[in-house]
Amino acid sequence: MGPQGTGGLAVAEGIDVAPWAMGGTGVHSFDELQPLEWPTRLEAGTLNGHGIAGLSTGLDFIEAQGGVEAIAAHERSLAERFLAGVREIPGIALYGAFDQPVRSAIVSLNVADIVSAEISDALMQGWGIATRPGAHCAPLMHRALGTERQGVVRFSFGYFNTDEEVDTAIDALCDLAC
């Protein structure tokens, strides 16, 4: 829930992590090597102040919503609602182990033998629904699933999605598949 490129590093005491980049630190600006003390040892160049502020705001937001588990529960609820609706649509192929509780809010599917990019485009053009079609950087998975030609359409439900949006997606898929 923060800007891309922000994060943290937890290192156990006694572990030596060598700097991967060298550059000014603002503390020892004329030294060619990184300082030995932490955290400046790993902070070459200018710190990403905007990213750090954004990450802090993201963490505050997570806390205000009741924590990561509360957010994940909402997202899983949306995915389960979506699955319950699309399972009833003829021609929808779902990919995943759905005999267990939904572990993430990502659902991958296909509509008949239509190429995933065509489905994704139709969802965006007709209903304003953004999905991710294709191979998702997982060619071996697609070989195992037999979806190399078609790819899959990936729905990713997030905290700001609503039940109404899920219902719209189900209706849209019904229109496309029926």
Feature locations, PLM:
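Pyridoxal 5′-phosphate
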Residues: 1-178
